[in-house]
């Protein structure tokens, strides 16, 4: 998993509440088990027509937001069915963090497990962040748990264990590999 320490990027506002996992990545695209390739179908029903033509009114299709790597959204992001593919699609598209009012618990944990930082902020902060210019960089400083713009700073909470995993780029396999010598020694001793 890629390390997440201090990240700078531009944002796209998608200020809907209750964006569910089927809206993030519809079920017809869940046939693969590889994490790559889901980004092209992210928000499929909103981004494309049935003929796969781009909807010019959807935020991600607007030229000024095409390179955004931070998503600003409303409450209850990632609700609905449990599908890790939703986090995969967001990450594969290029998002590194989501800043929203709240998340479903399963989506929140799936995001963290895949190196995608879900940040909770109050409505006032979300409104301020959503109004930023599409060209203004936002800095996310994970070690200091801080979102910085050119004019404001917003503090955020994160579990210290998840914070450490993200800063060190450790997924579950990476954590296990830290104990590889001890595991090998145990296996040799108990053959």
From Swiss-Prot:
InterPro entries: 3-IsopropMal_deHydase_ssu, Aconitase/3IPM_dehydase_swvl, AconitaseA/IPMdHydase_ssu_swvl, IPMI_Swivel, LeuD
Gene Ontology CC: 3-isopropylmalate dehydratase complex
Keywords per UniProt: Amino-acid biosynthesis, Branched-chain amino acid biosynthesis, Leucine biosynthesis, Lyase
Keyword Lyase among UniProt keywords: yes
GO MF assignments: 3-isopropylmalate dehydratase activity
Disulfide bonds: none
Residue stretches in coiled coil: none
Record-linked CDD domains: IPMI_Swivel (cd01577)
EC number: 4.2.1.33
PANTHER family documented for this protein: 3-ISOPROPYLMALATE DEHYDRATASE SMALL SUBUNIT, 3-ISOPROPYLMALATE DEHYDRATASE SMALL SUBUNIT 2-RELATED-RELATED
Family: Belongs to the LeuD family. LeuD type 1 subfamily.
Quaternary organization: Heterodimer of LeuC and LeuD.
Protein name: 3-isopropylmalate dehydratase small subunit
């Amino acid at each position: 998993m890629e390390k997440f320490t201090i990240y700078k990027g531009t944002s796209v506002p998608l200020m809907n509440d209750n964006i569910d996992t089927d809206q993030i990545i519809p079920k017809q695209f869940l046939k693969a088990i590889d994490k790559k390739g889901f980004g092209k179908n992210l928000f499929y029903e909103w981004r494309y027509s049935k003929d796969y033509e781009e909807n010019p009114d959807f935020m991600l299709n607007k030229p000024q937001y095409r390179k955004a790597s931070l998503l600003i959204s409303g409450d209850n992001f990632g609700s609905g069915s449990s599908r890790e593919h939703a986090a995969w699609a967001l990450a594969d598209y290029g998002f590194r963090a989501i800043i929203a009012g709240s998340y479903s618990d399963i989506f929140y944990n799936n995001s963290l497990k895949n190196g995608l930082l879900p940040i909770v902020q109050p409505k006032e902060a979300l409104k301020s962040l959503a109004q930023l210019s599409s060209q203004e960089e936002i800095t996310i400083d994970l070690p200091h748990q801080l979102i910085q713009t050119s004019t404001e700073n917003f503090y955020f909470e994160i579990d210290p264990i998840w914070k450490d995993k993200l800063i060190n780029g450790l997924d579950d396999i990476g954590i296990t590999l830290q104990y590889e010598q001890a595991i090998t020694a145990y296996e040799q001793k108990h053959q």
